[in-house]
């Protein structure tokens, strides 16, 4: 009886493979083409990027929000397989101190693919930051067994596959 009350005894299925979807409408680009060496030289990790055509940013995977920067320009998500993704909206947007960004989530929230994360003003980002590009980076690469790009060029938020990850 206690096992049923507290959810014990449930067998949790271990997720080892996940598809990461685009967090925004726009154009998919290789991380090495991002005009910032921190991302292009993969100092933060492997990933991909999207040049957005709209300011609606959604969750690219099912998981838990583990970080939302106080400036609302970046979100960290831990997927069901334990992969930690950073969705970084724009380059040098930290200097905007949250201006032009609205967060729709908080740390600890559970998210599904397509759930709204952030809304941003792309025109303001173009004016005040160096780029609107959105890098999606795997922060704990040691947990990744393999990563296969989907080869998409046009991105639709929450629908277009960016890559498939197999966790170790």
Swiss-Prot record:
Entry annotated with the keyword Transport: yes
Subcellular location: Cytoplasm
Keywords assigned: Cytoplasm, Kinase, Phosphotransferase system, Sugar transport, Transferase, Transport
Biological function: The phosphoenolpyruvate-dependent sugar phosphotransferase system (sugar PTS), a major carbohydrate active transport system, catalyzes the phosphorylation of incoming sugar substrates concomitantly with their translocation across the cell membrane. Plays an important role in the phosphorylation of EIIA-deficient PTS transporters. The EIIA domain can transfer a phosphoryl group to EIIA-deficient PTS transporters, enabling growth with maltose, N-acetylglucosamine, sucrose or trehalose as the sole carbon source.
Free-text comment on this protein's domains from its UniProt entry: The PTS EIIA type-1 domain is phosphorylated by phospho-HPr on a histidyl residue. Then, it transfers the phosphoryl group to the PTS EIIB type-1 domain.
Protein name per the record: Phosphotransferase enzyme IIA component PtsA
Domain PTS EIIA type-1: 36-140
Keyword field contains Ubl conjugation: no
The organism's place on the tree of life at top rank: Bacteria
Single Gene Ontology BP annotation: phosphoenolpyruvate-dependent sugar phosphotransferase system
Major location category of this protein: cytoplasm
Catalytic-site annotation from UniProt: 88 (tele-phosphohistidine intermediate)
GO CC terms in record: cytoplasm
Stored InterPro entries: Dup_hybrid_motif, PTS_EIIA_1_perm, PTS_EIIA_component
GO molecular function, one term: kinase activity
Bilayer-spanning residue ranges: none
């Amino acid at each position: 009886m206690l096992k049923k009350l507290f959810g014990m005894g449930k067998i949790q299925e271990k997720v080892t493979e996940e598809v990461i979807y685009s967090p925004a409408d726009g154009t998919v680009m290789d991380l090495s083409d991002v005009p910032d060496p921190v991302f292009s030289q993969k100092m933060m990790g492997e990933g991909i990027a999207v040049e957005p055509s709209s300011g609606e940013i959604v969750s690219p995977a099912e998981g838990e929000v583990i970080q939302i920067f106080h400036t609302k320009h970046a979100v960290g998500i831990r997927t069901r397989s334990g992969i930690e993704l950073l969705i970084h909206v724009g380059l040098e947007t930290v200097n905007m101190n949250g201006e032009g960004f609205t967060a729709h989530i908080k740390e600890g929230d559970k998210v599904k693919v397509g759930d709204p994360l952030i809304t941003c003003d792309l025109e303001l980002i173009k004016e005040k930051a160096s780029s609107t590009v959105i890098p999606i980076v795997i922060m704990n690469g040691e947990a990744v067994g393999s990563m296969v790009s989907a080869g998409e060029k046009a991105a639709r938020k929450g629908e277009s596959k960016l890559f498939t990850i197999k966790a170790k």
